[in-house]
Structure formats: C-alpha cells, structure tokens
Amino acid sequence: MFEKLMMWIESAINYTNGLLWGSVLIYVLVAAGVLFTLRLGFIQFRLFGHGVKLVIQGREKIDGISSFQVFCTSMAARVGTGNMAGVAVAITVGGAGAIFWMWLIAMLGMATAFIESTLAQVYKVKDSEGQYRGGPAYYMERGLGKRWMGTIFSILLIIAFGFAFNSVQANTMTDALNNAFGFDKTIIGLVIVLASAYIICGGLKKVAKASELIVPVMAVAYLAIALLVLVTNIEQVPAALSLIVKSALGWEEAAGGAMGAMMAGIARGLFSNEAGMGSAANIAASATPNPNHPASQGFVQMIGVFVDTIVICSSSAAIIMLSGVLDAPNGQEGIGLLQLALNNELGAWSSYFLAFAIILFCFSSIIANYSYAESNVMFLTKSKKVLFIFRGLVLAMVMVGSVASLSLVWNFADVSMGLMALVNIAAIVMLSKVAYSVIKDYELQLKSGVTPTFDSTKFPEIDNLEGGIWVNKNQKTAKSSAETN
C-alpha cells in the first residue's frame, strides 16, 4: 500500500514537473521577457554598459550590504553544477542549437530580472537589526495588499531553496570529493555542515561577505580553463558558432531537431539564470543601492543574468563543443561529458580542477540559497526561535543530502520552483506600472546628468512604503494627516 502511494506521488510529481518545465513555464517566462523588453525599450541593450559600471561601482564601502556583495550572492545561487552538467544535458538532448536559444532567453530574462529586483528594492523593509529585507513576498503584501500570496510564495521558496536544493548541492559535493579523492561521504558531510553553519549563523551580512570572496575566485578560475580550451582550438570557433546557429534554425540535423534545440535551450536558460523566478530578488532587496535608487539594483541583477548564462554557461558549451567529444559516441552525459571534454583537452589533472570547481560552486550555492530562504522565514514570522530552528533544519538537510540520494525530494523542489515562478510572474505583471515609472525616473535623471536618487513623494500612486527607507517619517506622517483631513 505504502509503495503504491509513493509510486503515485512520484508519478504525479514527475507529470507536474514535465508540464511546468516542458511547456507552461517556457511560454509564461518567454512572454514576460518579451513584454518587459518592449515596455522598457530594450534597456538591457541600451544601458548594458551602465549596468556593468554599477556592478563595479558597487564595490565601494557603505553601511550595510553593498551592491557588489549582493551581486556576488545572487551569482553564488545562480551559478552551480547546472551551469556545467545542465549545459551538457541541453547539448546532448537538443544539439548545439540549444546554446542559441539559451542565449536568447537570457537576453529576454535580463528585462524580467530588472523588473523584479527594482520592485524588491521599492517595497523593502528594515528589520529589528537594521538589515534590509524584501523580495516577492514583500511586494506582494505591500504592493498588491495580498499577504496570502506572499505567504504561498515564501513557503514554496523555503521548500525549494532552503531545504531541497541545498541537499542537492551537498550531494554533488560529496560525490565529487568521493570520486576524485576517495574521501568518506559522512566525513565530507560533517565538514560541509560545519562550514555552512559558520556562515549562515552569521546572517545575511556574513553570507554576503563570504560570497564576495568565493564568487570572483570560482568565476575567474572556471573562465580561465574555458579560455585555455578556446585558445588551443581557436581555428574551430567559426565552425562551432555556425553549427550553433544552423542547428537552432533547423538547417542542420540535431539530436532533437530545431524544436528539441529550442525547448532544451530555453529550459536550461530559464532554470540557470532564474530570471522571473523571484529568487534573486530576495537578496537584491538587501542591498544599500549605489546610486540610492531602486532601479540601480535592477541594473545589477540584469548583469547577473548575463554573466550566468552568456558567460558561464557559454564557457561550458565551448569546452564541450571544441573538445570533439560530441563527434564520437561515448555514452557520457551531464557532468561526465564535461569531464571527458576537459580530460581530452587538458589531461587527467582536470579531474581535480573540476572537483575544486564543484566544491566552490556548490558551497556558495548552499549559503546563498539559505539567504533567500531566511528572508522568507522572516516574512512569515519575526521569531528568532523559529529562525534558529530553521537553520538547524537546513543543516540537517545538508547532512542528509551528503550521504543519500533524494530524487523524490529534488523533483518536488523543481515543482515548488516552477509554482513559485508562476506566482511571481503574476505579481510583477500586476505591479509592472510601478516598476516602469520608477525605472523611467532613473533614466530621466541619468539623461539630465545627475546621480539618480529616489524621491518617493513624486510617486503618490506608490503607497505602503516603509518609513525611513524611501519615505522619511515626517513625510509619512504629513501624508497620513492630509488623507485623514
């Protein structure tokens, strides 16, 4: 009886997963990306350079969490083994053309990420310790007046990012270290738990500081390896680019044909850069923006989507396509295909490098995923006791994931993430007019040659903002008195 019930549950989860990630989410997120790209006048292309400037400028020391620290934290969550194994799977399933569609969806997703991160900044709050918190749950409550909607979103995010995805990352780390060096999985798990506990028990600020140290190292190291493969195979680059375009448009036979390439590439891109999911918006709200305007964080997170997909995922694609592993059947897929490609190009030592990369990618994802979930726990309850228990449960899932494969839990997390995205897209579409007006205000100030700052009194249609952040207390009191009279 129990076995039949579990089989039915697993079947239902797999069906829902296929429905969400095979069609519904692809259409919804692509439509949202197109809508926001058009309404913002292709801002991701027009002001791309300005966005890069803000990421670099975000390194300046300020009170609280800097824009660069937030950028690194969101990148820590975005960039994981999916940027390696996931790209390999997309190419295996959809052929080289999947890369083209992955690039296209990232460019559209940059506009969606801009909208959600701007809204997260507009409706952020300050907790009892003076730390900014925000994200979809907060703009659903304050912007739409729908706390119930924010509650649903928070629960879905906590399940996916707080528990399940962290067990996935821990499992990947222990497998990598066990395979490369033969280390005992239980010992590895305990080390991961202790290292994670040290960071997450320090709260958002410690997570941000750790991400600021880890992310640049892991990104530069991985890009250096990809660049080495690129340089040694530079003569093959034109042919590889031609194959990507031809396969995407159906001019070349591919594993799954033109449609297979499209679906595989779009799904991989969406899952990797998380644009529209509402995940990165949680940490975007924690920044003390520079310039002091909500839209500045929109620019920063827009660049995050670009780096994740156009830079990191493309590096994995280059390693695989230029190595020649696709030309001969080898039975490898996922991370195994990438490992084979590196071995062919760089030799056996690359196994150790890949293990090192996986450790950095996965550990940084664990602490960043936790930071997303923490803000949603604090949305549901302000209790420090509940937060303490939550941290214990996160660490327990990390330990369990280190020693056991939890495929059912992980598949359920994909469902949670998919539902989370649908809830978030509905919210940002309903709040899009607010985002458009705030972003337009930023652009007008930028064009006039002044450093953009946000004056909420110019936006009487935006209410329910927290006093002391974008509205000072005197202005808020005066506004309330005027409305009463």
PLM feature spans:
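Extracellular/periplasmic helix-exit of transmembrane alpha-helices
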Residues: I115-K124, I225-L243, G256, A285-P291, ...
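Helix-loop-helix module between adjacent transmembrane segments
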Residues: A32-T37, L108-G130, P136-I200, F356-I366
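Extracellular loop-to-transmembrane helix junctions
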Residues: N17-H50, T92-G130, V307-S315, S351, ...
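Flexible loop linkers connecting adjacent transmembrane helices
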Residues: F42-S67, V89-I91, G95-I99, A111-L144, ...
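N-terminal alpha-helical transmembrane segments of multi-pass membrane transport
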Residues: M1-T81, I91-A98, M399, V429-T457, ...
